[in-house]
Amino acid sequence: MRVIIAGSRSMTDAEQVAAAIACSGFAITEVISGGARGVDTLGEAWAHMHRIPVRRFPADWQRYGKRAGFRRNEAMAYVADALIAVWDGSSPGTRHMIATARQRGLRLFVWQPRQAPDHHRRGR
């Protein structure tokens, strides 16, 4: 399963990202990443540790300006089967990624680190 691992840039806790991945239940065969600091790069590191291929979609800020992150999210959602979002509840980029994944019909797992595991949301 091709899975986007994305989330808040302020997240620096690799254990939280690994927990989100484990709790998602997704059988990941490829990690799709936007390459941003925080969750994206922690997800890439997890993939490398587990010998899972990573496909990066860096935002083209020079070409698209403020819309670059949103365009990247849309491109990732086009090739993915699912999204694991580790979200602080306020990041607009992660909010957009979640909305885009829902719109495209991807399987969805949202992990909010301050919540207990039974409060994590699964959706389609």
Task: Report residues per predicted region.
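Acidic/glycine-enriched connector segments
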Residues: 2-3, 9-122
